[in-house]
């Protein structure tokens, strides 16, 4: 017999029992998100989902995303309850812009050492996000990988599939000169620009946990969960049929995201004076001495979603959105793009 001690997976840093305990903890979370099309529960090799009834030519739409370095801030602050909603929002908001109804969601959670309480908190947030989006959490992967991550640090990724009627896909092809642009507010920086945000906090030596803006803790403002716009937007599409294009304002801000849904000959003219920028963005700009153009290229500056409708549909669209609890406003218009001009023009930019 060898004198070498018998090694186990746990000796190597992987706790199978912890993984199984997590699955038991989150089964109820997944159950709360269940849609009738989903077949079976957690634990199988693959998740099964039928196409919802009523579609003539259903088209599946998929998306995957993470939450960037907002996760580092969450780890530093030991605040894990809302990062799951961020993850869902980043995926489902990308699907709804083409008119798709999210069907199901899967997550990937990778860590050096699995902390069951933290992971369960994160997944509970994912479940809450799925409920807000009306999609089902059908499974995921929890990977304990010693030597790949520092201690209990973790990384997150999400994957979502939705469905849209082929004839009702929103792709921006009908956008025309004279159309109006409607904005929906963000809750804060959402899940983008956090490498810049963290650099600003570092360089300015901001005591993040003891700073308040307008009576609110800076930590709450920076960690506010990304808004999920799915249900109000699906209602807008259903009730008006007026939506020509939508842009989810993520990394790249207004300047890089609006052009993704515009025809080449269209220019979005955005009036920056049409909304009051939330204080957290002014704070970051001042502390980091950030150029105004850079602000709009990196951060959403208070705008989470932009919707394009014909001018004669503006009031109807605003009314539906307000009835859904949104606070929309007209942020700009579509004009013919001049030769070589940028596809987004920001008007009334303040001098910095």
Swiss-Prot record:
User: Which reaction equation describes what this protein catalyses?
Assistant: 2-formamido-N(1)-(5-O-phospho-beta-D-ribosyl)acetamidine + ATP = 5-amino-1-(5-phospho-beta-D-ribosyl)imidazole + ADP + phosphate + H(+)
Which keywords appear in this protein's UniProt record, sorted alphabetically? ATP-binding, Cytoplasm, Ligase, Nucleotide-binding, Purine biosynthesis
Which pathway features in its UniProt record?
A: Purine metabolism; IMP biosynthesis via de novo pathway; 5-amino-1-(5-phospho-D-ribosyl)imidazole from N(2)-formyl-N(1)-(5-phospho-D-ribosyl)glycinamide: step 2/2
EC assignment? 6.3.3.1
Could you name the domain of life of the organism this protein comes from? Answer: Bacteria
MF terms (GO), sorted A to Z: ATP binding; phosphoribosylamine-glycine ligase activity; phosphoribosylformylglycinamidine cyclo-ligase activity
On whether Kinase is a keyword of this UniProt record, the answer is: no
Q: Does the keyword Ligase apply?
A: yes
Q: Which Gene Ontology cellular component terms are annotated?
A: cytosol
Q: Name one GO biological process term.
A: 'de novo' IMP biosynthetic process
Its subcellular locations are: Cytoplasm
Q: Which family does it belong to?
A: Belongs to the AIR synthase family.
Task: Extract the PANTHER family matched here.
Answer: TRIFUNCTIONAL PURINE BIOSYNTHETIC PROTEIN ADENOSINE-3, TRIFUNCTIONAL PURINE BIOSYNTHETIC PROTEIN ADENOSINE-3-RELATED
- What is the designated name of this protein? Phosphoribosylformylglycinamidine cyclo-ligase
């Amino acid at each position: 017999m060898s004198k070498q001690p018998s090694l186990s997976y746990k000796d190597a840093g992987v706790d199978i029992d912890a993984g199984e305990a997590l699955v038991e903890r989150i089964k109820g979370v997944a159950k709360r998100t269940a849609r009738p099309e989903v077949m079976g529960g957690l634990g199988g090799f693959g998740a099964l989902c039928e196409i919802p009834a009523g579609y003539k030519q259903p088209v599946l739409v998929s998306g995957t995303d993470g939450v960037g370095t907002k996760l580092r801030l969450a780890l530093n602050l030991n605040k894990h309850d809302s990062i799951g909603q961020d993850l869902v929002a980043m995926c489902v908001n990308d699907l709804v812009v083409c008119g798709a109804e999210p069907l199901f969601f899967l997550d990937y959670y990778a860590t050096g050492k699995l902390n069951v309480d933290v992971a369960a908190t994160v997944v509970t947030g994912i479940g809450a996000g799925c409920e807000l989006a009306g999609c089902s959490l059908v499974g995921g992967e929890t990977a304990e990988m010693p030597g790949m991550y520092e201690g209990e640090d973790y990384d997150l990724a999400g994957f979502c599939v939705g469905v849209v009627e082929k004839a009702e896909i929103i792709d921006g092809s009908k956008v025309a000169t004279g159309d109006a642009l409607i904005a929906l507010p963000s809750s804060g920086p959402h899940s983008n620009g956090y490498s810049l945000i963290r650099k600003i906090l570092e360089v300015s030596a901001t005591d993040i946990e003891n700073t308040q803006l307008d009576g609110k803790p800076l930590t709450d403002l920076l960690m506010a969960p990304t808004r999920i716009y799915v249900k109000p937007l699906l209602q807008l599409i259903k009730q008006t049929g007026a939506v020509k294009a939508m842009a989810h304002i993520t990394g790249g801000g207004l300047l890089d995201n609006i052009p993704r849904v515009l025809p080449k000959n269209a220019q979005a003219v955005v009036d920056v004076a049409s909304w009051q920028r939330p204080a957290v963005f002014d704070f970051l700009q001042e502390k980091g001495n950030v150029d105004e153009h850079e602000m709009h290229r990196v951060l959403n500056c208070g705008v989470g979603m932009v919707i394009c409708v014909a001018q004669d549909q503006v009031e109807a669209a605003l009314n539906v959105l307000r009835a859904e609890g949104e606070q929309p406003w007209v942020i700009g218009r579509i004009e013919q793009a001049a030769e070589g001009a940028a596809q987004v023009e920001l008007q009334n930019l303040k001098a910095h």
